[in-house]
Amino acid sequence: MKFAPMDKVKFKTASHLNKLRTLKKRVPELDDPLLGECWEFEEDGLRQFDWEENYEFVARPKHFNWD
């Protein structure tokens, strides 16, 4: 699976990027060098961006405080 470079990943707001950084610290398995540059937030959870396919659901933390 190929991943898009960071400049092609659009976050809805800057706070989403900050939340991703926090999430990666709290959920170590998400802190993968290949995955860390191609995450994007959607309303129903964290999704991984794949240019060859559509959005692919990757992870939705059940007990993560987004505030």
UniProtKB/Swiss-Prot annotation:
In Swiss-Prot or TrEMBL terms, this protein is called SPbeta prophage-derived uncharacterized protein YoqF
What gene makes this protein?
Answer: yoqF
